[in-house]
Design a protein with these regions (language model features):
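N-terminal secretory signal peptides
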Residues: 1-26
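Small-residue-enriched, tightly packed secondary-structure blocks
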Residues: 29-190
Length: 190
């Protein structure tokens, strides 16, 4: 077998392994202390976002709810996968626990960790999110990835969307973050 065929085979197997691992992790249950730790990390990630983008404090106060993923891990070598756990806040208090997963393929390489926040700006957007068996961005969901200006202000056109997504705190080497194709599902281990 030639070296290029071995490399291609390794890339395919690595991609499948990443995707399978993310899928298996999505089904893991969590104990009460682990949930408490997740809430603490989500509160800290929310504070980081408020510090980095001060306008998000008002956005959180005016939104029907918001979902914070304090740590989303993404890795890829041709095939990619990402996974994280998050907390839904309503009225500033934890109201549910969620997983985020994603898979992709193409010319990509790297690994990174980042935080992600989803603001549901209308009661209808939050109700739709809560009533579905999983939100998949890019599948008919009207959302905007926030464009934040140098002043920390959020663009007016972004504020008019029912779901606003922020990606922040990136660490690692990876060529960009793609939120389309991510799937968010409620955890059943509350």
């Amino acid at each position: 077998m030639s070296l290029s065929r071995l490399s291609a085979r390794r890339a395919v197997l690595t991609g499948f392994g990443l995707t399978a691992g993310a899928t298996l992790l999505a089904g893991c249950s969590t104990s009460a202390p682990e949930r408490d730790d997740l809430v603490a990390r989500a509160v800290a990630a929310r504070a980081d976002l408020f510090r980095q983008v001060p306008a998000t404090r008002d956005l959180a106060a005016s939104s029907a709810g918001y979902l914070i993923f304090p740590s989303v891990t993404q890795g890829a070598f041709i095939f990619g996968a990402q996974y994280g756990n998050g907390v839904l806040f309503e009225g500033g208090k934890p109201a549910g626990f969620y997983n985020i997963t994603g898979g992709s393929w193409g010319l990509q390489l790297g690994a990174q960790n980042f935080s992600q926040a989803y603001f549901f700006t209308t009661p209808e957007a939050l109700a739709t999110f809560r009533s579905t068996r999983g939100l998949e961005l890019g599948a008919g969901v009207d959302f905007a990835v926030a464009n934040v200006g140098a002043s920390g202000a959020i663009s007016t056109s972004t504020l008019q969307k029912p779901v606003i997504v922020f990606v922040y705190g990136q660490q690692g080497l990876f060529a960009g973050v793609n939120v389309a194709g991510q799937k968010i599902t409620e955890r059943t281990d509350r």
